[in-house]
Structures are given as structure tokens and as C-alpha cells.
């Protein structure tokens, strides 16, 4: 468990907590959901923010101090992440914002997923031989969907916040103007994508200094992005999707060979969607609906698993059952899930306890089910280059948000004069049925591109609530987001505290390839041997088995905050895997 320090720092700060009343913050371990009979507090003692970058967490804290609520703070955190984590998210991308309004008790998800432009038909992504053009699907203008993140920031401020949008954007505008130190992952990521990014004049203008690429430790300023944010703050939706910024975006896409229309930008809309809700062992789980695949998969896995008391099982059998639930949920993900505005998603059936009970009956508690006995084809993936933040404010409002540009530095294209790095989310569609995408996996008809359609996602911002606790959690990590959130929920149910949950060892199974991926030290030698004896194939760090990814992939960056209603104590956890720097959990009290 991390040790809390009362001293603030900007470097390496990953969770910043604002205490607004005498009760103190604590990272003491969470107890079971019904362990206490103490009175339930009406409101948290303060506010908690957990994000992947110190400056983003600090920006949210600043807005809370200025009188904003969790939704205003979310605007500040999201926009600042767009400035300081360009490898992962930005105004040129999209995301999901799961919201809880404490006053009304209402939960809603803002779907700000990117949409396919009219030009984005399957045929446009095939070469002369009819094969998938991989360069076009992940690089440049053709790989980019119409961005949704700016519209989400406008909606958060207008419908849910209490401060002007311009005020909540002020921290990100300042940081974009004054700059921040380049960290190692930024510099290394640019080096790995340099050939693509330097194809485009607008990108070269931002990332080259005297002809040389950004280097670790130097101050990175983005005046064009600051101007774009300023226009968004001054003019709201029209400041990005119409007028000056829109004209520059359209010109940049056209110059790079793409085809966007002004009406497509002006016509973008955030969708309000009803979250998926279900019960698990005394917890109410609220999570993301389609076009996220996460909520339906979580409902299936947890409702399968509630047939056993996992906390009483040995490591081998517990892991076996969790993996078997993953296997079945990911099989269904492939066949049934897509944008609900275009595809008939059987959500009621897939999230029902009866359906989960039927799946549970197919699990042998002592033997692995070969994936080829569960008919179908592999699941489409998305990349690790995503970010997540979690917020609880002093009124009890909550935000869980996951946002992305898809691959490392998205499409690599910045339309000149905007500072906006465009996403490459078009690769998350099934661009050619039966052909693997950038990650060697397949896609099928439910996720085929159509004008205005939103691509399937694994982003899974989630709330947990019991009589005693309220929790927000989420993580980046591509298709493994869902299983990492699952393991986080199981950790909380087992009584772990927030920091312990964020640091839990992780493993993953996605049906096909039929292999358990695991990070370093996820399994003891005895557990690994026991799983293999049950018939599971393991891909452990150092292995070279085909289809496995071992520890070379990032295993998420989980950010979570927790309110213990009985003790009226807030705590939080920030993932020690965070690639920006070493994870720390720190406190801020009034006057600091």
C-alpha cells in the first residue's frame, strides 16, 4: 500500500485529494460491503481526483477550489490531459463520460465516441488487390473519425457544471501556452511514430524544434492548441465544430488526402445513453453501455461469477473461473455488439441473470473449455493509448471518464494551425470482415463502418456502490480494459483498499487467441502449473508463444477513488504502472 505524503509536487503526482472539512483522508484498507453499522454520511468530506498526470489532477483541484463541481473539474482534467498526454488522448479524439448527479440520483453516460465520415466506406480502405491498406487504416486523414471530445466538454459545462466553460478550460489553456516538461514516454513514442508524423506540415510545426524532435526534459509549448481551446471556451460548440477551427480542420484533412465535410463537423452530437446497471454481491454496478462493449461484458462476467464465493477458493480455481467468464463474455462481444444506433444489440438478454446462469452451467469447475468449442471468430481490439480519470466531489457527484485517440499519437496528423492531433479510430471498425486489424485480430459485420456510425470500444468507466461505499474506477488498456476493471471490482469486493486495487496483478483472456495473458508476477509458479493442468494455455512474460503479448504491453493505468460512507473517509488509488512517472498518492488540505 502506498504511503501518503502531505507535501504537494507537480512531478509524479497521480492522485490529488482536496479535503474541505475536518475529517482526514485515509488509504486504510476497505472492509467488506456490509461490515459496519455506523451511520451513513450524507456527503463526502471533500473531493477526490485520480488521473494519469499530475497537471491534470491539479487542474481539476483548482476548479473545485474555484467553486466548481465534479463535472466542472472533469472539463479541466479532460482538457488538460488533452494537452499533456497527446500520445493517449486529445481534442481530436473521443471518449465516454459516466456521470452521477447526487442531487437527482440520476446516472447517465455521455457518448462522445468519434463517428465515421461519409467517405469512410469499407472499399476506401482496400488496396488494388482488395486487401486492407494498413497504412491508410491507421495513419493520416483516412484513419480519423469526426472528433467527439470537444462536444463532450461543452455539454459537461452547459448541462451539468456550474462554472462557465471558459473558466474550466483556463488551466489547460495556461499549460498549453506555458508548456510542460516532455516525459520519456512522449519522446520515445514520437521516435517510434516519427516517420508518419513528419509527413504532415502541421505536425512538424508542433513537434520539431529547429528540425529536431521533442526530447525528454525540454519544455513543450503548444500555442496553436491553446488558441483552439480558447476558441472553444469563448464560443462553445461553434468554436470547434464551426468557424475558424473547423475551416482549419477541413483544410488539413483535405491537404492530407482525406474527405471531411463541414456538415459532418457541424452535425456531430454527443449522445446521452442510459448506463448498464446490475447487482453483484451487494454492490450496484453502473457502467458503460454500447457502443462500449465493456458494460455488457462486465455484467456477463460478474453475474456468471456470483454463482461461486471466489474469496473462499484457492488461487488456481478462482483464476480458472474468472478466465472462463472472460472467455464467454468476449465471445459474445464479437458477435452481438456495435453502435446501437445501427445494430440491434440484444442488451436485455446479454445482461440478464438467466443468461449468465446458462453460461455458468457450461463451465467445468476443474477443466478449461477450449475456445474452439465456443463457436465464432476473434474479437476486434483497440490500443493501449487511452487515459482515464475518476472524480468524487463534496456533494457526492461522480465522474468516471475514459478518453482516447486510439493508437500512439493517433493518426499522426495535426491540421495546420489547430494543434489538434487527430485520432485513428477508423481502425477500430471491421474494415474488411475476416481480416485482422493493426493488432492481428478480426472484425465482423456488427462493427462495419457506415457514415455517422460509432466504432465499438472497450472503454469501461464504472461506478460501484453499496450501503457503505461509493467507488469510481477505470483504466486504459485496449481490449484488456474490461478485464482489468473486472479484476478491480473483484479486488474491492475482497476488501482491498483503493491503492491495493490499482496495483493488483493482472491477467486477461479474450476468447481468441485461446491463451491467458499475464503480467510479471501475476501468478505464482504453483498457480501457473495448476492452470496448465486444467488445460489453460499461458502466455507469461518471457514466453514467445504465438498470439501472446506478455509484459511488453502496458497493463493499464487504473485510476480509482472511494468514499466510505460509514467512516466518511475518502481515499484513492493511482496505478503504479503509470508510464508518465512513478505513482504517488498525495494529499492537499486547505491552504496548501
Show which residues each predicted segment covers:
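Bacterial N-terminal signal peptides
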Residues: 11-23
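Bacterial N-terminal signal peptides that target proteins for export
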Residues: 2-13
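Short, small/polar residue-rich loop motifs at catalytic or cofactor-binding pockets
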Residues: 272, 383-386, 408, 457-459
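Active-site rim segments in enzyme catalytic domains, especially the processed small/beta chain
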Residues: 83-109, 259-261, 398-466, 494, ...
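Internal maturation/activation junctions in enzymes
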Residues: 308-405, 418, 425, 433-434, ...
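Noncatalytic scaffold domains of N-terminal-nucleophile
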Residues: 27-58, 62, 70-235, 240-242, ...
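M16/insulysin-pitrilysin zinc metalloprotease superfamily fold
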Residues: 295-310, 464-471, 478-502
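Extended C-terminal subregions enriched in glycine
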Residues: 319, 453, 485, 493-552
